[in-house]
Swiss-Prot record:
Superkingdom as given in the UniProt entry: Eukaryota
Subunit structure: Homodimer. May interact with ROPN1.
Compartment annotation: Membrane
Pfam family, one: IQ
Gene for this chain: SPA17
Ranges of compositional bias, category Polar residues: 153-163
Start and end residues of each IQ domain: 114-143
Name this polypeptide is given: Sperm surface protein Sp17
Entry's Gene Ontology molecular function annotations: calmodulin binding
Membrane keyword on record: yes
Annotated function: Sperm surface zona pellucida binding protein. Helps to bind spermatozoa to the zona pellucida with high affinity. Might function in binding zona pellucida and carbohydrates.
Native species: Papio hamadryas (Hamadryas baboon)
Mode of membrane association: Peripheral membrane protein
Main localization, broad class: membrane
A GO term from the CC aspect: membrane
């Protein structure tokens, strides 16, 4: 007898989730009519690629997941054992210099990326504004033409009162 709402969890082999994610992504991208045949062709191409390049996406994905879930970089580190104060100072100053350089490099790269993104956003907005102006000009000109046609059809002309 099975329990319909059981609290059991099945263990999925490492890397299998990544393979299924890749297949799902390609199915959504390609929208094939025959999904099982497409999946078979997709897995065959992955096997060929793995044989040619010695790169296994399932293995790579399992390593990435393992690194993500087993990363101990953010745990508290034990204080280093006491040694010569001069050595500690040189080690600390060297680390500070390295981190400051990498922070500057990354911030410069980030600034460049932000500038490129800002230019793209500004260009898109300017294009949007220009399209709206053109649309407004078209509707204004159509309305003016309709008014002129209506005034000609009725025979009435608009008078301006002169003083």
């Amino acid at each position: 007898m099975s329990i319909p709402f059981s609290n059991t969890h099945y263990r999925i082999p490492q890397g299998f989730g990544n393979l299924l994610e890749g297949l799902t992504r390609e199915i959504l991208r390609e929208q094939p009519d025959n999904i099982p045949a497409f999946a078979a062709a997709y897995f065959e191409s992955l096997l060929e690629k793995r044989e040619k390049t010695n790169f296994d996406p399932a293995e790579w994905g399992s390593k990435v997941e393992d690194r993500f879930y087993n990363n101990h970089a953010f745990e508290e580190q034990e204080p280093p054992e006491k040694s010569d104060p001069k050595q500690e100072e040189s080690q600390v100053s060297g680390k500070e210099e390295e981190t400051s350089v990498t922070i500057l490099d990354s911030s410069e790269e980030d600034k460049e990326k932000e500038e490129v993104a800002a230019v793209k956003i500004q260009a898109a907005f300017r294009g949007h504004v220009a399209r709206e102006e053109v649309k407004k000009m078209k509707t204004d000109s159509l309305q003016n033409e309709e008014k002129e046609e209506n005034s000609e059809d009725t025979g009435f002309t608009s008078r301006t009162h002169e003083k």
